[in-house]
Amino acid sequence: MTSISNVSKGAIIRFKGEPHIVESLVHRTPGNLRAFYQANMRNLKSGRNVEYRFSATESVDVIITERKEYQYLYMDGADYVMMDSTTFDQINVSEAAIGSGSRFIKDGITLTIVFSDDGAILSVELPTFVEVEVTETSPASKDDRATSGTKPAIVETGAEVNVPMFVQNGSVIRVDTRSGDYIERVKK
């Protein structure tokens, strides 16, 4: 157990028996009231966001974590099969553990898996940006190039991304895995 004042953004704590990642932690000292810490956390099992007010003297249980690099190999039913980059051990990871970023996982991508002190998978971190090929989008016309709108495109992983009008089938684009937004066209 450690004081809430020693916890920082990104720490994983046990809150009400469940692992939560601290997304923001702000110290507040209102007028004539006692100081407190306002925390925004995300439950790593359910994915729900939780807001909680800790007193300045409160203690929390910080979970000791281990981060390892894994490479995606293939799908096995509803699970993703990953291989440890150093020991070549394989593990199965559920889609729920990966979250919404699972739509950008492609063969050979390297992910970081966060394990708890008891060996359970807490979260899976994708690279911030991935490069994917556009497989299906509407053809561009001469008028489209003069406007600055977007159009939907299907990428090689099956995800749908809104792209600028100039992007065509076969183009390689960089996408932000956190939001699913188009970043830029990659020139190869």
Swiss-Prot record:
Superkingdom of origin organism: Bacteria
A cellular component annotation (GO) from this entry: cytoplasm
Pfam families reported in the protein's UniProt record: EFP (PF01132), EFP_N (PF08207), Elong-fact-P_C (PF09285)
InterPro entries xrefs: Elong-fact-P_C, NA-bd_OB-fold, Rib_uL2_dom2, Transl_elong_fac_P/YeiP, Transl_elong_KOW-like, Transl_elong_P/YeiP_cen, Transl_elong_P/YeiP_CS, Transl_elongation_fac_P
Keyword terms of this UniProt record: Cytoplasm, Elongation factor, Protein biosynthesis
Localization (cell): Cytoplasm
Pathway(s) where this gene product acts: Protein biosynthesis; polypeptide chain elongation
Recorded GO MF terms: translation elongation factor activity
One BP annotation, GO: peptide biosynthetic process
Principal location listed in the UniProt entry: cytoplasm
Classification via CDD domains: S1_EF-P_repeat_1, S1_EF-P_repeat_2
HAMAP family, per database record: EF_P
NCBIfam families for the chain: efp (TIGR00038), PRK00529.1 (NF001810)
Function: Involved in peptide bond synthesis. Stimulates efficient translation and peptide-bond synthesis on native or reconstituted 70S ribosomes in vitro. Probably functions indirectly by altering the affinity of the ribosome for aminoacyl-tRNA, thus increasing their reactivity as acceptors for peptidyl transferase.
Protein family: Belongs to the elongation factor P family.
Name used for this protein in its record: Elongation factor P
